[in-house]
Amino acid sequence: MAKPRLLVLYFALIVVPAWVSSIVLTGTSEPPDAQTVAPAEDETLQNEADNQENVLSQLLGDYDKVKAMSEGSDCQCKCVVRPLGRDACQRINAGASRKEDFYTVETITSGSSCKCACVAPPSALNPCEGDFRLQKLREADSQDLKLSTIIDMLEGAFYGLDLLKLHSVTTKLVGRVDKLEEEVSKNLTKENEQIKEDMEEIRTEMNKRGKENCSENILDSMPDIRSALQRDAAAAYAHPEYEERFLQEETVSQQINSIELLQTRPLALPEVVKSQRPLQRQVHLRGRPASQPTVIRGITYYKAKVSEEENDIEEQQDEFFSGDNGVDLLIEDQLLRHNGLMTSVTRRPAATRQGHSTAVTSDLNARTAPWSSALPQPSTSDPSIANHASVGPTLQTTSVSPDPTRESVLQPSPQVPATTVAHTATQQPAAPAPPAVSPREALMEAMHTVPVPPTTVRTDSLGKDAPAGWGTTPASPTLSPEEEDDIRNVIGRCKDTLSTITGPTTQNTYGRNEGAWMKDPLAKDERIYVTNYYYGNTLVEFRNLENFKQGRWSNSYKLPYSWIGTGHVVYNGAFYYNRAFTRNIIKYDLKQRYVAAWAMLHDVAYEEATPWRWQGHSDVDFAVDENGLWLIYPALDDEGFSQEVIVLSKLNAADLSTQKETTWRTGLRRNFYGNCFVICGVLYAVDSYNQRNANISYAFDTHTNTQIVPRLLFENEYSYTTQIDYNPKDRLLYAWDNGHQVTYHVIFAY
């Protein structure tokens, strides 16, 4: 082993200095000759060559150190090694060894229960080991050694080569060479940059000299150019009043053009002459900076002004960005929000006007009388008229109604009260309801002579047993008891019968194989509610679909009673579900977190011992459509042969009561269908929940009391659908299919 090591060290000592010296020489801008090399550079190269042995010793020193390995707590180990020298190997080979020609390893330990071990490569301890093994291999042929002995010797020689040490030394040498190359490249880059700068300076100086020479030649060849230019300049500045006179003529021409333009407009009426400020303020409002935007919802039109009023252009430009501009237009915060039932118009009180304001106000009152009288007014004699409160500061005018018994007065209101509508329980004849009118359209109609017919709301009565109306929510206006079973004014009317259901769109993968996810159709936000599994007592809320995909829930509701099945719904801020193992249905208020209503289904055919497995559908299933809340459950047919039938009943969302007039017994049978849902008062049932290509094989129309077999294709993409619910707000079917949350688009036939 000693000979290969000596060869490697000798090669490194010879090659590396020559390589380094060649690199250093090539790094200069001009290669020096032998005579031009300074004595200082020769001394530096010689010192570097002499120090190569020290550098290699430093490279090998940290590797040749013996490593100490310790075991135990509070243990400190130290290894002291005394290796053999090269002369010791020679004495051992010559047979004249001494007592000190042995390497020793001493272990120094400190600490309780401490175990130390010293690890070192053989070449670091006994440099004679390589020579000894090489000699043995050479004598193997003459001594007829066994193959196993040769293998042992080869293995020892292989380990004695100490390839790890060679690799470490090579890596460090390569690192040093890389550093040298990096430094040389930096020096070359700096020198190149310096050369470029010198070249730029030389080029700039040459250009300057060339221009100076050219200018001198031009001046020499054309001596009269400078004098001619001086004469022209003197002529141009000889009359200083010329520029002022030109500007004055331009201003006069602009004034003449503006006067001619204004004279072409027709003159206005005499009573409109003094109205100047409102027009200026409206124009100034349009010129506000972009940092204070104003949304204009209404425009007041005035007749043309005389030419004298239009000449005040400079005054308008001076006040263009002033803060004294009055606001006489409708802005977004003052508008009454259109909820689909009522229409109102509000205006800010105008500034004090003279002459013209009185005429316009009287004319506006005279023209808006039919329109104002059409608004519903509070009256004890006719309870079908609705009480409507205006919003924001309004124009205090009293309109003259054609009917003296119904007088309409618009009063200012500082706050926005809740809009309520009162109706009678019995139907009364009413005119057909025209389409809703926006505030801007109503204002424009009020300024014309054509009156708008009165708007009335027609509702259907359910009889004397109609329950109380729902509470108001931020997402929908308060409805009367007759209108609580028909929310088409809030969500939208049905377009027609169901035509097609598109393929499923996977929105998320969440939870277990069974579960339900739903949205509140009457909510203003996009919150998603999830019940994981078909039994439990926790309802999880997500802020929107994106948070649901990320698994970031925003709220959790611990229900006082457990639910069973997947037929729950969230409707008008409440969670409706079937209490586990009972005939009870519960309405849980999500905002107040309490049980708002409780009811028992006396005729439900409930299985007392429900097996702990999914049967393909829920025994009690809630549904929501454009008409409100529905309940689907199995019951015994009292009129027939006491068979179980599926009952569809319109459910009162306030107290969970049902009525016989709105309860239908369908032709469905339990355990013969998968999932069902209601769209526009029609019950649809899917024939299978665990087949990929299923069909909507049953439909019952509550409007005509007829049932058909539509045979519409319904795809269970993951072949395990445990919930299908219709949302009338976005007209989508929400389904839970084997742990995947999917949606279906509903297409209607026109």
UniProtKB/Swiss-Prot annotation:
O-glycosylated and N-glycosylated. One of its GO terms (molecular function) is identical protein binding. Residues 1-22 form the signal peptide. GO terms for biological process: extracellular matrix organization; signal transduction. GO terms for cellular component: extracellular matrix; extracellular space. Residues 493-750 form the Olfactomedin-like domain. It is found in: Secreted. The gene is OLFML2B. Homodimer. Binds to heparin and chondroitin sulfate E. Residues 40-68, 179-213 form a coiled coil. This is Olfactomedin-like protein 2B. It comes from the Eukaryota. The keyword Coiled coil applies. Its main location: secreted. Disulfide bonds join C494-C680. Residues 346-437, 452-484 are annotated as: Disordered. It comes from Homo sapiens. Keywords: Coiled coil, Disulfide bond, Glycoprotein, Secreted, Signal. Residues 354-384, 393-413 have a biased composition (Polar residues). Pfam families: OLF.
